[in-house]
Regions:
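Bacterial Sec-dependent N-terminal signal peptides
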Residues: 1-25, 29
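A low-complexity, Ser/Thr/Gly/Pro-enriched, surface-exposed linker/loop concept
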Residues: 29, 44-88, 126-127
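Hydrophobic or amphipathic alpha-helical targeting/insertion segments
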Residues: 92-118
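Generic recognition of long tandem-repeat/solenoid scaffolds
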Residues: 30-36, 53, 86-93, 106-109, ...
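Catalytic-domain carbohydrate-binding cleft regions of carbohydrate-active enzymes
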Residues: 114-606
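Broad, structure-driven detector of short, well-ordered beta-strand segments within folded domains
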Residues: 41-45, 95-101, 188-190
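Short beta-strand-initiation
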Residues: 29, 38, 76, 85, ...
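Short, exposed beta-strand/loop patches in secreted or surface proteins that constitute
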Residues: 22-27, 34, 43-44, 77-83, ...
Length: 606
């Protein structure tokens, strides 16, 4: 009898063990939940060609706040679910998913059975104790085919086009604008819904995505068949890109900086006198009187008297005007003092004696907008240039120093800086866009900023590539940086034609702007800028107006005219960006996905 009882207990224990290993399956809308001994997995179709995957440990939760994804309701889809001892098979009209019950890993196929992508191993959760919270390092590995190319991830100025065999750290800096969206020549994309430091790595064995802070692992697999369709799926989840006013696609004249009203108006008048095509003039920083009044949100009356009349004169000459503002605020400004009274400022003092406001706090964003509206929009400003939205608090120069300084701030309105490291620009642009649209529907929103994150295309913001130096190598790297940025689903990108700095930040022209060698580089960068989504000259140390480049100026004028001759075509493409989720600046693999010779070409595009 004793041996029979022992045998029965062994059988029962084995059955329980096998049940724990194979997992329990629960049907949910458009998908299933799988529960195993040490991992929970949720698979849901958000469209026939988009699947969301959430994985979490038993002690954690599937719940989370998504800042990037705004599609929060599931459509009615005809999803079939079949279960056997080992697998759960989910089928939509476009995709089949195999969920392995033993360990919760997934494999994706077309409806005809062709492999799309496979998870290489089960998800990895490593408990970690951080300042202010306990969480997990999270990681998912994938198995790719050897012959596919990978693109996206935002803007990285390392000169690489195809990210096969590469490692990329996703941390915002002055010249790195990151977004965790990856796209393949095989017609799939992954949107990785995490805001902390993230590392993409591709080796011969596996491709992996690792993030520093997460309660769960959350990603979307988008299968479009073509790269255009994948990007459309990304925008289905995160928002459409609005159409700018036609003027925004014309030429933008800027420099660091126009020092007073007379200089600004004289540049506008000189362009019209010379009959050089142009739509836009930009007032950079220091329209305030000192660092203590940094980003005060109104013109210094001594340098720019009667700003409303000044802008009326600009508008009367068929110009639009954009102005630079910062999330860092000087201590003598009224906006700083009201932010401080409400507890909306971070304690860290920035490099120009300012403090940054907490853009994760909706009330702080509303207060920020109040000062913009009353001091700048009210006098006729057409567009906002929001600088330093990484945020680059202390003028850090590397990803490591930027990460360290941002984390040192500690907490924001939503949680720890480690958890929301990369999302400052997204939440700030989101709220600025919403406030502008709520206040007036008479003018389309245009903004320029130096950072990006997934979803930011919905905010009417263009990103520029940061404070680059002037050199041929840096110029070359702009091309692959801009292409991968646009292939990450964010359609509007630009750069400082001529480089922000001539003889520093990697710039090599120590003899200044009158050096013919620099003028030649400027001309080539100007020609490239002609064929970028947004056409903008900007920089320091030397004037950037078209007539300031000696024998090279006629070449600049020629390409400026070419931009305007192309305007009907450019504006038609811009409508396709909004209406059809098109990409204007196209890496060659988008149009030649079956030609491996195009995969690493980072100096050509469509």
């Amino acid at each position: 009898m004793k041996s029979q009882i022992t045998y029965s207990l062994m059988i029962l224990a084995l059955a329980i063990s096998q049940c724990g290993q194979s997992g329990k399956v629960k049907p949910i809308q458009n998908g299933v939940d799988l529960k195993t001994r040490d991992l929970n997995v949720r698979v849901q179709f958000y469209a026939d060609d988009i699947a969301r995957v959430i994985k979490w440990r038993p002690e954690s939760s599937a719940e989370k706040l998504s800042l990037m994804v705004i599609r929060d309701s599931l459509p009615d889809l005809s999803i079939t679910v079949e279960e056997n001892d080992n697998d759960v098979i989910l089928k939509s009209e476009r995709m089949t998913i195999r969920l392995v019950k033993k360990d919760g890993h997934l494999e994706y196929f077309t409806t005809s059975g062709t492999s799309i992508l496979k998870e290489n191993k089960k998800a990895i959760f490593t408990p970690v104790t951080l300042p202010y919270e306990k969480a997990f390092n999270i990681q998912q590995n994938f198995k790719l085919t050897p012959d596919e190319g990978l693109y996206g991830l935002g803007q990285h100025q390392d000169g690489y086009m195809n990210y096969r065999g590469r490692t990329v750290k996703l941390v915002q800096t002055n010249t790195d604008a990151v977004t965790p969206f990856l796209i393949s020549t095989r017609g799939w994309g992954i949107l990785w819904d995490n805001y902390s430091k993230t590392i993409f790595q591709d080796t011969a064995e596996t491709m992996s995505l690792w993030s520093e802070v997460g309660d769960n692992l959350d990603y979307y697999l988008i299968y479009g068949g073509t790269m255009d369709s994948v990007i459309s799926g990304y925008r289905y989840l995160t928002g459409k890109a609005p159409l700018y006013g036609k003027w925004a696609y014309g030429y933008w004249q800027s420099k660091e900086h126009y020092k007073n009203r007379d200089e600004l108006l004289s540049v506008v008048s000189e362009y019209r006198r010379r009959r050089i095509p142009i739509d836009n003039i930009i007032q950079d920083w220091n329209y305030w009187d000192s660092n203590e009044n940094w980003s005060q949100m109104f013109f210094d009356p001594k340098k720019y008297p009667e700003p409303e009349e000044m802008i009326r004169q600009i508008h009367n000459q068929n110009f639009h005007i954009m102005i630079s503002i910062w999330p860092g605020l000087g201590p003598n400004t009224a906006i700083y003092q009201e932010m401080e009274q409400n507890g909306f400022l971070y304690n860290t003092v920035g490099w120009a004696n300012f403090k940054y406001f907490d853009a994760f706090n909706p009330a702080a964003n509303d207060l920020y907008w109040k000062y913009i509206k009353n001091g700048l929009i009210s006098v006729g400003i057409d567009a906002l240039w929001i600088d330093s939205t990484e945020p680059d608090i202390v003028n850090a120069t590397t990803k490591e120093s930027e990460e360290y300084e941002m984390k040192k701030v500690g907490r924001n309105y939503l949680g720890s800086w480690a958890r929301y490291l990369n999302a400052y620009s997204l939440v700030m642009m989101d709220k600025l866009y919403q406030n502008q649209r709520q206040d007036s529907d008479r003018k389309r929103v245009y903004m320029l900023t130096r950072s990006v994150f997934a979803g930011q295309q919905r905010t009417g913001a263009t990103t520029w590539s940061g404070d680059i130096g002037a050199s041929w190598e840096i110029y070359q790297n702009q091309i692959s940086a801009g292409l991968n940025f646009c292939m990450a689903g964010i359609p509007y990108w630009t750069f400082d034609i001529g480089g922000f700095v001539i003889g520093a930040y990697g710039g090599v022209f120590i003899n200044g702007g009158q050096d013919p060698a620099y003028q030649e580089l400027y001309t080539r960068m100007f020609q490239f800028g002609t064929f970028c989504p947004i056409f903008r000259a900007h920089g320091s140390e030397t004037p950037r107006e078209i007539w300031c480049f000696g024998e090279f100026s006629p070449h600049l004028i020629k390409f400026d005219h070419l931009r305007y001759r192309l305007m009907p075509y450019i504006y038609s493409l811009a409508w396709r960006v909004t209406n059809d989720d098109y990409t204007m600046m196209r890496g060659l693999p988008m149009d030649f996905p079956n030609d491996p010779e195009t995969y690493s070409l980072g100096d050509q595009y469509m």
